[in-house]
Amino acid sequence: MAPSKSIKSVVICVLILVLVLEQVQVEGKSCCKDTLARNCYNTCRFAGGSRPVCAGACRCKIISGPKCPSDYPKLNLLPESGEPDVTQYCTIGCTNSVCDNMDNVFRGQEMKFDMGLCSNACARFCNDGAVIQSVEA
């Protein structure tokens, strides 16, 4: 019976990561002129504004490709932020939201093994899927 719980938790982790990856690929990305424009866009979207309205009001563009135009470079909110920071933030967020929830549902010795697999899956997801030039809209 114990291996059954172990397999279930790994399957749940993989399914959640696949769903997140599919959503990331479908959505457009926003590129902003500078940090002030990025903050404006994020605030507008958080308040419920649509992507086109917020992009127009905040000097940003919605793109469908993986890279921002050179005159719209801003992904990072802080000038000193870079790819390692983004990857680490992604990995921590994935681990906290996916793996920790699995830990709350299933307890036991095999869960420690599953948590390791889940953490590795998050690291692979964030390292392979990190795109620095743009951010999800």
Curated annotation (Swiss-Prot):
Stretch forming the signal peptide: 1-28
Pfam families per UniProt: Thionin
Family annotation (InterPro entries): Thionin (IPR001010), Thionin-like_sf (IPR036391)
Principal subcellular localisation of the protein: secreted
Propeptide residue interval(s): 75-137
GO molecular function: toxin activity
Disulphide bond pairs: C31-C68, C32-C60, C40-C58, C44-C54
GO terms under biological process: defense response
Gene Ontology cellular component list: extracellular region
Subcellular location: Secreted
Record keywords: Disulfide bond, Plant defense, Secreted, Signal, Toxin
Family: Belongs to the plant thionin (TC 1.C.44) family. 4 C-C subfamily.
Biological function: Thionins are small plant proteins which are toxic to animal cells. They seem to exert their toxic effect at the level of the cell membrane. Their precise function is not known.
Name listed for the protein in its UniProt record: Leaf-specific thionin BTH6
UniProt organism field: Hordeum vulgare (Barley)
